[in-house]
Amino acid sequence: MFLNTLKAVFGTKNDREVKKYFKRVAQINALEGKYQNLSDDELKAEFAKFKEQILSGEKNENDILNDVFAIVRETGKRTLNMRHFDVQLIGGMVLHDGKIAEMKTGEGKTLVATLPVVLNAMSGKGVHVVTVNDYLAKRDAEQMSAIYNFLGFSVGVILSSQNSDIEHKQAYDCDITYGTNNEFGFDYLRDNMKFSKVEKVQREHNFVIVDEVDSILIDEARTPLIISGPTNRTLDGYIKANEVAKQMQKGEAVLPPAKPEGDFVVDEKNRNILITEAGIAKAEKLFGVENLYSLDNAILAHQLDQALKAHNLFEKDVHYVLRNNEVIIVDEFTGRLSEGRRFSEGLHQALEAKENVKIQEESQTLADITFQNYFRMYNKLAGMTGTAQTEATEFSQIYSLDVISIPTNIPIKRQDKDDLIYKTQNEKFKAVIEEIKKANSKGQPVLVGTASIERSEVFHNMLVKEKIPHHVLNAKNHEQEALIIQDAGKKGAVTIATNMAGRGVDIKIDDEIRALGGLYIIGTERHESRRIDNQLRGRAGRQGDPGISRFYLSLEDNLLRIFGGDRIKNIMDRLGIEEGESIESRIVTRAVENAQKKVESLHFESRKHLLEYDDVANEQRKTIYRYRNELLDENYDIRAKISQNIAEYSANVMNDYILDESGSNVNFENLKAKILYECSTQISEKDFENLSVIEMQDKLSQILENSYNEKMSRLGIKELRNIERILYLQVLDNAWREHLYQMDILKTGIGLRGYNQKDPLVEYKKESYNLFLELVNRIKFDSIKLLFSVQFNQEEVQNLENKANEENEKLLQSSVEMGASEDNLGEAEFKKVPRNAPCPCGSGKKFKECHGKSGPKQGILA
């Protein structure tokens, strides 16, 4: 109550921020007359003066913001016949300040971006504008290029259809580059696998504006970008596991101490499968193994777990579709197909086995990064969206981004009606169809939002039966997305769309539709996130247009069934709601929103938790990539580095074979064998007589230095440095890939440390640091072994870089993918444990009833 009084008197924090920006808008408006009286050439000349002031360091962007915004506004009027509204100027300032501008649908975010883009492109360091798909990247770049070109800027577009590094490099070399989040991220990973600086396509990460920032930085935050290569693991286990999974019976979850019946139970809240004691026994019999959870059968146990998930947690046409005999993921937030993306940890193979299509090879990660860490590399990050306030805390804590809600140019007239809740889905479906018929009879356009392809096809079939013409937009026909959405505001149009398919394309209406009440939005169930629901509502009522939105729910909807249906069901029972009747109440709507807040909080904590782990790997990634970039620099003294590594290798090897502290007792036979094997160099025991430990280390280092110099003396200095650089890079890349595998295994098992009263994150940091030290030593020592062992003829020396690049290119062409969401940290490895012995995790349960599941064996870093 007290807070509400304060807000009424002083306004919210957002109100105060907007008020500050409005003061500067008045200053920009005062310049409008000055610039509109200039000719085109005079306007360009004036802009060039400001650009020179930035390049010379005489002024910074904030000093010239008012004039530049006024010039961009005038340029928009002349080239596009579009004038930036006052609220759009505010949006531009918010973006320039490195914040998120929340602007409602139809408020012209594409035009707003031109203001900070031009201002920040003046430094010559480049500006990136990120969109959610190729269509929007190309459209926005083409539409706004008239402004940019007038002011002397070049514009490039990165598209997934472009296969050439040359095309990408040309786009990045432009002053302003548009593209999708995936392409920007993958180009960064690919650049850090190149063997020379000139082959890299990206330049400095200066300033980026992320359009639909909530979709990219929140919804896809748990989805890593992965470049991966094939493994040699057999796929037969997935076929066996699929057959076993089909024979296992699902039971109902019960509260302890009661034991569940059946072979397994499904935990829908955490999207997990729990195999019962009876299920373990049945699986062991069907597989023909004695202990499913022994280390020898660890992979088989994991494959069974994934097969059960595939059959019980993943629905065809909801979570994935079959296209050309391939399993294609459906993005849960947009309803679009995620081409090229595969579920990780064998889940995709389990789905392929379930659907009886060709099972593709498992892959090993070669390079990866999350969007969270990619976009945090930029010197300045900003974003635009129509829906961000519900996630303001996350934007602030994770990205240090403030969210500023920008007032609409014209007040919103859309009516957002309370939810209607029915007992069953069938009652809800019928009510939705009746409402569509009612609106359609008078010509009012209707947009029906569904949560899955399956649901959209249910409504499609019902509308066909009612003979109501309509369009369906889901992942199966997304190619026509823009056209279907553009027509959704026409008289009599009925459009069914999964989630936010068509986001970024405006639905425009004419005066006749305005008279009918505008576009009618019908949501057929609530999403787990209020933000996604708000995005659906936001399709109506753009730029002051009228519109209506309403959600139709049932107690059988997943959100209500899993997270809060009992309370609402009790209310309906008390009110005596009969079949076919609905309840409409603010109390019920608030109960639904509370269920959503509960889920949003769970997801936020999950993303925050995963980021804490990913930050550890990210610091290591940055260190390795920074070192890799140093190696690519022609001025880097690779020879000095090799000499240093030889010295460290010599000290390390000598220490392994010195049997006492004095150094008087050395196992020379084994030492000589090791040096001969690893460095192709003969050493004599006489060379080390009467020397201290340090002197012996130095002596070995000197011998190896001389041997190395003699070996490489037949090569020219330039050729030698090139060989050293490329081989060193290959060792580094291979060691980094092995390290990523080790880190995956570590993360998989670290969660169970909590059972031993240890903080898993602290343990992860400690052990990952030790792994990183091993990685550094491996790079040093393996590079020495490789440089001593290789033999080249002149032709091979000349072609070494080309060959390395060709092999890398093959790898890259066949292995770019998107990982699936990393929702859970996995479980630890166990040595062979008797079935009835206590589980090593410390839970107090028998091993066969608890955590026995294991990932692949942990490799050993050399």
From Swiss-Prot:
The residues that cross the membrane are none
Question: Would you kindly state one Gene Ontology biological process term found in this protein's UniProt entry?
Answer: protein targeting
Q: Which GO terms describe its cellular component?
A: cell envelope Sec protein transport complex; cytosol; plasma membrane
Membrane topology of this protein: Peripheral membrane protein
Q: Which residues bind ATP?
A: 88, 106-110, 506
Q: Which EC number applies? A: 7.4.2.8
Job description of the protein: Part of the Sec protein translocase complex. Interacts with the SecYEG preprotein conducting channel. Has a central role in coupling the hydrolysis of ATP to the transfer of proteins into and across the cell membrane, serving as an ATP-driven molecular motor driving the stepwise translocation of polypeptide chains across the membrane.
**Which protein, by its recorded name, is this?**
Protein translocase subunit SecA
Organism annotation: Campylobacter jejuni subsp. jejuni serotype O:6 (strain 81116 / NCTC 11828)
Q: Which gene encodes it?
A: secA
